[in-house]
Regions:
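Soluble FAD-dependent oxygen oxidases
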Residues: 2, 18-558
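Fungal secretory targeting signals
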Residues: 1-18
Length: 558
């Protein structure tokens, strides 16, 4: 019996090296102490071994704190245990990376990728940890931690790429008079947050298209997922703005990627005045409030037709929601560039007129019109947020076309389901910023085309305290996946999902996330990463792998 065990153990590491990513204890592939020391010396001294530590308890709800640590993640549902937590009596690394490289330049990244390849290690990449899907972590992985890769922000009055190339302007976009973009640009030299980039752009009297959560990294998953913004209706999706990347490939080579150099990779990386309104109930009637919410959805095409864009949030029950009102209310804020208050008010008159009858049905409709001196002030006063972290959250989202937004019956059914029940902490965030520049046929992108065809992105989520028992957590996950998410998909079966604010448990994620772009993206990944060094949950190519419980990542065809 002992001899049989020894035979199995001696064969298993060899099989795992071919079919699974290496994990601690694999004698054949896991790096020895000598190899690790040599690797650390080559960096030099930037290799970190991650060890669970109870002292993080006091800073668990700080996004900035999580950003400063290689295993700090804003939303903890994907981790092995919550701190302070109610589901575990002890804490281990779980799915967090085993080692991290504190990279400060491209050469560090190159060395890390080559080391991971040599030892068949899983690779994770993390900047700030603002990640709803668990894409920046991985069991027993080597993490490339980019938080301290900061080589400056540079403003260019007139852009010229390193390869004398710029993407062509899409037809219909205001032209500079040249066939290629030659206007102003900003080089973001590494791991800067949107808060830092916004401030820098403001000092240059410029506007950048970026996220509303200002602690999010400006370069990374936000742009690769597309990136929605308060200014996108006027300027386009965030990834449309990218002129050039400097990229470290899976083989460790550093290359320039733009519309003339490595164009297929450039295409893949570009993938994926104000009028606030408030709608609240003066008596505790869920039914009348949801009628009003459904009517409000019907006004969103009118808001966009008035050349305004922005966001709304609503909740049907009092609760501790993360991103929406904590009482029964719908709040929204929409802005327009170079518009007077009188002009905005006149443009919004049809919207107000459609909502006004709700005042006689127990609703309280309020509209306020405010002028701001510049976009920077407007954005920070109205839209910018740091978002409370350290709680667990699961969400789903759906793009809605105009046809869905005028279907009163179907809208009311969706609103009733997504509103949820008391105690669920269910809430909805609505991005009303489609059309305009978003709808332009921009070249060299692999954004899901349904985004450009849609007017609204509707996000539904639930969050729960870290002391929630496992069965309660599982119920919330199933509710978002099979009830609320299914309701959104029933309303808009032919659209898709914004992949950065999505459900990592979505059983149909390949279609919902990528749509018709999937074959193109898979071909590009195979070309640049034939051995699948890069993997993340729900990312392109992830369907060919499976994660063992508390174990390695393995190929499905094994």
């Amino acid at each position: 019996m002992v001899g049989w065990k020894l035979v199995v153990l001696s064969i298993l590491p060899c099989l795992r090296a071919d079919t699974c990513k290496c994990v601690p204890g694999d004698a054949v592939c896991w790096p020895t102490e000598t190899a690790l020391n040599a690797f650390n010396a080559s960096l030099p001294g930037k290799l970190i071994q991650n060890i669970p530590c109870a002292t993080i308890q006091t800073n668990w709800n700080s996004s900035l704190f999580h950003a400063w640590f290689p295993t700090g993640y804003d939303y903890s549902y994907a981790l092995n245990c919550d701190i302070p937590g109610g589901n575990t009596s002890s804490c281990s690394l779980g799915d967090s990376p085993y080692y991290a490289v504190n990279v400060t330049n491209a050469n560090d990244i190159s060395l890390a990728l080559k080391f991971a390849t040599q030892h068949n290690m899983r690779v994770a990449i993390k900047q700030t940890g603002h990640d709803f899907l668990g894409r920046s972590t991985g069991y027993a992985s080597l993490e490339i931690w980019t938080h301290n890769l900061r080589q400056g922000l540079t403003f260019h009055d007139s852009y010229l790429s390193t390869s004398q190339c710029s993407p062509q302007e899409p037809e219909g976009m205001e032209s500079t008079g040249a066939a290629l973009w030659a206007g102003s640009a900003i080089t973001i030299g590494g791991a800067y947050t949107w808060a830092e980039v916004y401030q820098f752009a403001h000092e240059q009297n410029a506007i950048v298209v970026g996220g509303t959560c200002t602690g999010v990294g400006a370069v990374g998953g936000y742009l690769q997922g597309g990136g929605h913004s308060a200014s996108m209706r006027d300027f386009g999706i965030a990834t449309d703005q990218v002129l050039e990347y400097t990229v470290v490939l899976a083989n460790g080579n550093v290359v320039t990627v733009n519309a003339c150099s490595n164009t297929d990779l450039f295409q893949a990386l570009r993938g994926e005045a104000v009028a606030p309104m408030e709608l609240s109930s003066t008596r505790p009637s869920k039914h009348s409030f949801l009628d009003a919410v459904a009517t409000w959805y019907e006004t969103t095409p009118m808001i966009l037709e008035a050349n305004l864009g922005g966001y709304a949030g609503w909740a049907a029950w009092d609760g501790d929601t993360l991103l929406a009102p904590k009482v029964r209310r719908l709040e929204s804020a929409f802005g327009g560039f170079n518009r007077s208050v009188d002009d905005i008010q006149e443009s919004m008159a049809p919207v107000v007129a459609k909502l006004a009858p709700l005042n006689s049905k127990g609703m309280n409709i309020m509209a306020e019109y405010i002028a701001f001196p510049d976009y920077f002030t407007y954005f920070h006063d109205v839209h910018a947020n740091s978002m409370n972290v350290g709680q667990s959250i699961i969400m789903t989202s759906r793009f809605l076309r105009s046809t869905q937004l005028i279907n009163s019956t179907a809208l009311r059914q969706m609103v009733n389901v997504t509103a949820g029940l008391p105690g669920q902490n269910a809430f909805t965030v609505v991005g009303v910023n489609g059309g305009g520049a978003v709808a332009l046929d921009v070249p060299n992108t692999t954004i899901n085309p349904v985004w450009r065809q849609s007017l609204v992105n509707n996000l539904v989520a639930r969050n729960w305290p870290d002391t929630a028992p496992y069965l309660e957590v599982k119920a919330a996950q199933d509710d978002i996946t099979y009830v609320k998410g299914a309701s959104l998909e029933s309303l808009a079966p032919d659209t898709g999902t914004y992949i950065n604010e999505a459900n990592y448990k979505d059983p149909n994620y390949l279609v919902n996330f990528y749509g018709t772009t999937r074959p193109t993206l898979e071909a590009i990944k195979k070309n640049y990463d034939p051995n699948d060094l890069f993997y993340c949950v729900t990312c392109i190519g992830s369907n060919y792998w499976y994660q063992q419980a508390n174990g390695p990542l393995c190929r499905k065809d094994s």
